[in-house]
Curated annotation (Swiss-Prot):
The record marks K324 as: Transition state stabilizer. Substrate binds at N113, T163, K167, R285, H317, S369. Binds 1 Mg(2+) ion per subunit. The basic functional RuBisCO is composed of a large chain homodimer in a 'head-to-tail' conformation. In form I RuBisCO this homodimer is arranged in a barrel-like tetramer with the small subunits forming a tetrameric 'cap' on each end of the 'barrel'. GO terms for cellular component: chloroplast. This is Ribulose bisphosphate carboxylase large chain. GO terms for molecular function: magnesium ion binding; monooxygenase activity; ribulose-bisphosphate carboxylase activity. Its EC number is 4.1.1.39. It comes from the Eukaryota. The modification N6,N6,N6-trimethyllysine is found at K4. Keywords: Calvin cycle, Carbon dioxide fixation, Chloroplast, Disulfide bond, Lyase, Magnesium, Metal-binding, Methylation, Monooxygenase, Oxidoreductase, Photorespiration, Photosynthesis, Plastid. The disulfide bond which can form in the large chain dimeric partners within the hexadecamer appears to be associated with oxidative stress and protein turnover. It catalyses: 2 (2R)-3-phosphoglycerate + 2 H(+) = D-ribulose 1,5-bisphosphate + CO2 + H2O; D-ribulose 1,5-bisphosphate + O2 = 2-phosphoglycolate + (2R)-3-phosphoglycerate + 2 H(+).
Length: 465
């Protein structure tokens, strides 16, 4: 057949409602808002084309390959309830389109170019189904939940953390002092904030040294294993690795990375190093809201969470749920399960568009952090369960008596909630009573309860189904 130049509708090639998806296909669910006058089939096909083999006109080199083998296909379109102009377009991509073990390449293909497409008003990637054949090309988290518990020798409860504040401006020695005040009080971890890298007021090497001293002193005093998330994020991969190597030489248990600002290539590199060298890896999601906050455009956090599990990280920040609306709770628990479990069933009520099988890729601990304090402890324990990290920054350092009593208050509250749950009490209903009872035995907790008794952060949820 001779080459026929010209422009033809995408849907003639890329909209294939009769296509039966394969177990090896990567499946994507896009929320598409077409421009007025663009039919949904054409918009869905355009997304499939521009994120796989297509371009705006017919090219003669199409004849040199088998497009049927390599093209993305829009195989199903459904309306979005309550939204006249939005549709969910399901696209299947053949596995051959993607480099093995590269989240970078996967995202460059699926979300690389198509989001600036003129025929679309807005486009949001709601979910991805990663086939087991592709999952198996990734190392995933350096260690995973069970190995981390064994390393730390901590079982049967959530882990407790605290972000050191003020996040910027402390000298290395004062920073280390704050770490030392928190850890002996009962916290498992303290944390660098996401933007603590190596600034003029505190260079990274000084911070690492003082924090390591605080960790080892706390361990000697308490008999518990302690850690501080040393942020290795840097301007170059080489510098990042230099910091991770120094952390390993100090003998500390965990380092940290900002995976979105640092990038997936850097993150996967660091995750491989951490597995080879016995370091845990804490992941902060700085910049995520730029990508995931708009309901119509961008990418849902559940996709970023799946990508992180593939790229590698042992902890990741996942929101708090507390004080927010019910729908948001279900959505958050949906991606928390995606992080922790081996096999997650499709469940649209929780925002899960596909069934995901991780074939024993290690799990990631979700981290609840941001605006939480002792009164939230029962709800957090109930919502997140044991396999989580609860992080109280201001909720530790803001204690009226100082950092160490703040740490004690959080640990007492947590142990009280875990004990009450194990005795069969209902944390959702009796939470406040449980905290009040515990505070009779702990003056530190009583003082914390008094300070934060009225604080709430309640706004309407951005993220609805």
């Amino acid at each position: 057949v001779g080459f026929k130049a010209g422009v033809k509708d995408y849907k003639l090639t890329y909209y294939t409602p009769s296509y039966e998806t394969k177990d090896t296909d990567i499946l994507a669910a896009f929320r598409v808002t077409p421009q007025p006058g663009v039919p949904p089939e054409e918009a869905g096909a355009a997304v499939a084309a521009e994120s796989s083999t297509g371009t705006w006109t017919t090219v003669w080199t199409d004849g040199l390959t088998s497009l049927d083998r390599y093209k993305g296909r829009c195989y199903h379109i459904e309306p979005v309830a309550g939204e006249e102009t939005q549709f969910i377009a399901y696209v299947a991509y053949p596995l051959d389109l993607f480099e093995e073990g590269s989240v970078t390449n996967m995202f460059t293909s699926i979300v690389g170019n198509v989001f600036g497409f003129k025929a679309l008003r807005a486009l949001r990637l709601e979910d991805l189904r990663i086939p087991t054949a592709y999952v198996k090309t990734f190392q995933g988290p350096p260690h995973g939940i069970q190995v981390e518990r064994d390393k730390l020798n901590k079982y049967g409860r959530p882990l407790l953390g605290c972000t050191i504040k003020p996040k910027l401006g402390l000298s290395a020695k004062n920073y280390g002092r704050a770490v030392y005040e928190c850890l002996p009080g009962g916290l498992d971890f303290t944390k660098d904030d996401e933007n603590v890298n190596s600034q003029p007021f505190m260079r990274w090497r000084d911070r690492f040294l003082f924090c390591a001293e605080a960790i080892f002193k706390s361990q000697a005093e308490t008999g518990e294993i302690k850690g501080h998330y040393l942020n290795a994020t840097a301007g170059t991969c080489e510098e990042m690795m230099k910091r991770a190597v120094f952390a390993r030489e100090l003998g500390v248990p965990i380092v940290m990375h900002d995976y979105l600002t640092g990038g997936f290539t850097a993150n996967t590199t660091l995750a491989h190093y951490c597995r080879d060298n016995g370091l845990l890896l804490h992941i902060h999601r700085a910049m995520h809201a730029v990508i995931d906050r708009q309901k119509k455009h961008g990418m849902h956090f559940r996709v970023l969470a799946k990508a992180l599990r593939m790229s590698g990280g042992d902890h990741i920040h996942a929101g708090t749920v507390v004080g927010k609306l019910e729908g948001e709770r279900e959505i958050t628990l949906g991606f928390v399960d995606l992080l922790r479990d081996d096999f997650i069933e499709k469940d649209r009520s929780r925002g899960l568009f596909f069934t995901q099988d991780w074939v024993s890729l290690p799990g990631v601990l979700p981290v609840a952090s941001g605006g939480i304090h002792v009164w939230h402890m029962p709800a957090l324990t109930e919502i997140f369960g044991d396999d989580s990290v609860l992080q109280f920054g201001g909720g530790t350092l803001g204690h009226p008596w100082g950092n160490a009593p703040g740490a004690v208050a959080n640990r007492v509250a947590l142990e009280a909630c875990v004990q009450a749950r194990n005795e069969g009490r209902d944390l959702a209903r009796e939470g406040n009573d449980i905290i009040r009872e515990a505070s009779k035995w702990s003056p530190e907790l009583a003082a914390a309860c008094e300070v934060w008794k009225e604080i709430k952060f309640e706004f309407e949820a951005m993220d609805t189904l």
